From Swiss-Prot:
This is NADP-dependent malic enzyme, chloroplastic. Keywords: Chloroplast, Metal-binding, NAD, NADP, Oxidoreductase, Plastid. Its cofactor is Mg(2+); Mn(2+). Pathway: Photosynthesis; C4 acid pathway. The lineage of its organism: Eukaryota, Viridiplantae, Streptophyta, Embryophyta, Tracheophyta. NADP(+) binds at residues 318-334.
Length: 573
């Protein structure tokens, strides 16, 4: 049996995105054959000045384009020159979004070929500002909006989306956008950005991706903003909220089947954990803030141990922030320690401590703690300040996921450096303004000894004549390849063991050259190859009996690479 990429994981390749090659011809179908002006206005098919002489004759494009014919590569060069002329990141973001709406293949080729430069533009940190100003810059719908007005009609509204073969949905309710709080309906920039990365980095076909925003109101911060695009009412909670989410999840499964991946994105803590627990046994669901963040941080830690020495179980961890990201990371670390040592999970959790807004999480606070914090309450006297917790616990690893900027103060970092030769410090909060400390602060305050990673990128730092290239613990290392692995295997559920496999696969991609440059996370320049290796989570899906696409390919990495979407232009009949 030959495994080929003609259908990208078993879903019909509507636009010939995978089955055709540059030398093969396809028909640009919309409701009818697109030609002339309509072809230029269709982002799936538009090639701009790259239309050949024959295509211009065949599809009535003569006179609608200047006479020159240019290559795809020259278009990329031209667009990069244009984007680099903008000094303001939001202007670059808007230019990229305009390109995506005009020429989809050029957008993805541009992003793939220049991923390290453009990733901070199409996603964090720039996407945070884009969400804050989404009402001002909104031009054209890029996904589906479900508000309380659509309650009882979600199944019908889903049918309004033109693509019918959906593989991945990223959905948010806008309540906790990055570290920026409740942005309501304007959180749509997050699903749009995430799915752009699913396609560019993980090779999922753009036509198989659906961004969704659930609008149940907001905190009324936009009540006086005349350009706000969402409901102008207080956020719905309780039964009203649950019923809308139930209807949405049921409708998605009815429309697209059991194998569609639903990624929950930027839900508030109280909903994020509940939704994952509620639907995890009945749907293929994934929470990037809880599971994706955990997987990439665990990979970074596993790689960092090559520089520090020792196993995970020999280290002590202190977290600032006990929300969905912090507790998700902690649980995956505890699971990996349990897997490595055979020690029960309840015991490995005791190596991990947490500080929230009220101080160190200890057993004397148990009755007042939210359910997801209780596993991390250990025997210790109460401690209010982070620096005192550091001095008392003496962690070897300090991880920030608090969303509170500049909380890793000079005193905190210096305390870490007093009892650690190489303190591991991960300041993970996004965007950059909310990072617990900067790369420069971590290196200078630790006298160049820290092993540092952040959620958003920082420029290389020079300290005492040495250049330090800090790692970026960006979820984009994990979720695109993770999603690809689920799709190519036809997985019907996500299992924690898959997250451990993804972490191990990413850690294995860190080279000796990376270590010599002071980073324990591989560069984004190789991200599509990294994603193909992370897609080995498919093997775990087969092992656990959760895969439905049979038989299992012999070489999953090669199969994953063959299934990846290519932005190369196609020739039209």
């Amino acid at each position: 049996i030959r495994h080929e990429s003609t259908v990208t994981g078993g879903v019909q390749d509507v636009y010939g995105e995978d089955s055709a090659t540059e030398d093969q011809s396809i028909t640009p179908w919309t409701l009818s054959v697109a030609s002339g002006f309509s072809l230029l206005r269709n982002p799936h098919y538009n090639k701009g000045l790259a239309f050949s002489e024959r295509e211009r004759d065949t599809h009535y494009l003569r006179g609608l384009l200047p006479p020159v014919v240019i290559s795809h590569d020259l278009q990329v060069k031209k667009m990069m020159n244009s984007i680099r002329k903008y000094d303001v990141p939001l202007q670059r973001y808007m230019a990229m979004m305009d390109l995506q709406e005009m020429n989809e293949r050029l957008f993805y080729k541009l992003l793939i070929d220049n991923v390290e430069e453009l990733l901070p533009i199409v996603y964090t940190p720039t996407v945070g500002e884009a969400c804050q100003k989404y009402g001002w810059i909104f031009k054209r719908p890029q996904g589906l909006f479900f508000s309380l007005k659509e309650k009882g009609k979600i199944h019908e509204v889903l049918k309004n989306w033109p693509e019918k073969k959906i593989q991945v949905i990223v959905v948010t309710d806008g309540e906790r956008i990055l570290g920026l709080g409740d942005l309501g309906c304007q959180g749509m920039g997050i699903p749009v950005g995430k799915l752009s990365l699913y396609s560019a980095l993980g090779g999922i076909r753009p036509s198989a991706c659906l961004p969704v925003t659930i609008d149940v109101g907001q905190t009324m911060k936009f009540v006086d903003d005349e350009f706000y695009i969402g409901l102008r009412q207080r956020r719905a909670t309780g039964q009203e909220y649950s019923e809308l989410l139930d209807e949405f999840m049921y409708a998605v499964k009815q429309n697209y089947g059991e194998k569609v991946l639903i990624q929950f994105e930027d839900f508030a803590n109280h909903n994020a954990f509940n939704l994952l627990a509620k639907y995890g046994t009945s749907h293929l669901v994934f929470n990037d803030d809880i599971q994706g963040t955990a997987s990439v941080v665990l990979a970074g830690l596993m790689a960092a141990l090559n520089l520090v020495g020792g196993s995970l179980s020999e280290h002590t961890f202190l977290f600032l922030g006990a929300g969905e990201a912090g507790t998700g990371i902690a649980e995956l670390i505890a699971l990996e320690m349990s897997k490595q040592t055979g020690i029960p999970l309840e015991e490995t959790r005791k190596k991990i401590w947490m500080v929230d807004s009220k101080g160190l999480i200890v057993k004397s606070r148990m009755e007042m703690l939210q359910h997801f914090k209780r596993p991390w309450a250990h025997d210790h006297e109460p401690v209010q300040e982070l620096v005192n917790a550091v001095k008392s616990i003496k962690p070897t690893v300090l991880i920030g996921s608090s969303g509170a900027g500049r909380t890793f103060t000079k005193e905190v970092v210096q305390a870490m450096a007093t009892f650690n030769e190489k303190p591991i410090i991960f300041a993970l909060s996004n965007p950059t303004s909310q990072s617990e400390c900067t790369a420069e602060e971590a290196y200078s305050w630790s006298e160049g000894r820290a092993i540092f990673a952040s959620g958003s990128p920082f420029a290389p730092v020079e300290y005492n004549g040495k250049v330090y290239a800090s790692g970026q613990a960006n979820n984009a290392y994990i979720f695109p390849g993770f999603g690809l692995g689920l799709i190519i295997s036809g997985a019907i559920r996500v299992h924690d063991d898959m997250l451990l496999v993804a972490s191990e696969a990413l850690a294995d991609e860190v080279s000796q050259e990376n270590f010599e440059k002071g980073t324990h996370i591989p560069p984004f320049s190789n991200i599509r190859k990294i994603s193909a290796h992370i897609a080995k989570v498919a093997a775990k899906a087969y092992e656990l009996g959760l895969a439905t696409r049979l038989p299992q390919p012999k070489d999953l990495v090669a199969y994953a690479e063959s299934c990846m979407y290519s932005p190369a232009y196609r020739s039209y009949r």
